[in-house]
């Protein structure tokens, strides 16, 4: 996985991630939408034959896009740990 900042402003962040597809894009964008202060969280694949995605994050100014991304990633980590804990109970 290789991550590059395509565009960054005070309330906007656009990342290009090499080697990933809808799986990561949907997971991160979905979690970002639940972070308070995020007004846009989306992703797209620039080309269907390349493993590459672009994530766009826009906030209302109460939180930075990078902080929102960090919170979303933490949520994903907690979700994964919870899933593993539940799986061990089965």
UniProtKB/Swiss-Prot annotation:
Record-linked CDD domains: RNAP_L (cd06927)
Quaternary state and interactors: Part of the RNA polymerase complex.
GO annotation terms (biological process): DNA-templated transcription
Molecular function as annotated in GO: DNA binding; DNA-directed RNA polymerase activity; protein dimerization activity
Protein name per UniProt: DNA-directed RNA polymerase subunit Rpo11
Subcellular location: Cytoplasm
Record family assignment: Belongs to the archaeal Rpo11/eukaryotic RPB11/RPC19 RNA polymerase subunit family.
Catalytic activity: RNA(n) + a ribonucleoside 5'-triphosphate = RNA(n+1) + diphosphate
EC number(s) from the headed UniProt entry: 2.7.7.6
Key words of the record: Cytoplasm, DNA-directed RNA polymerase, Nucleotidyltransferase, Transcription, Transferase
NCBIfam families registered for this protein in UniProt: PRK01146.1-1
Functional description taken from the UniProt entry: DNA-dependent RNA polymerase (RNAP) catalyzes the transcription of DNA into RNA using the four ribonucleoside triphosphates as substrates.
GO cellular component, one term: cytoplasm
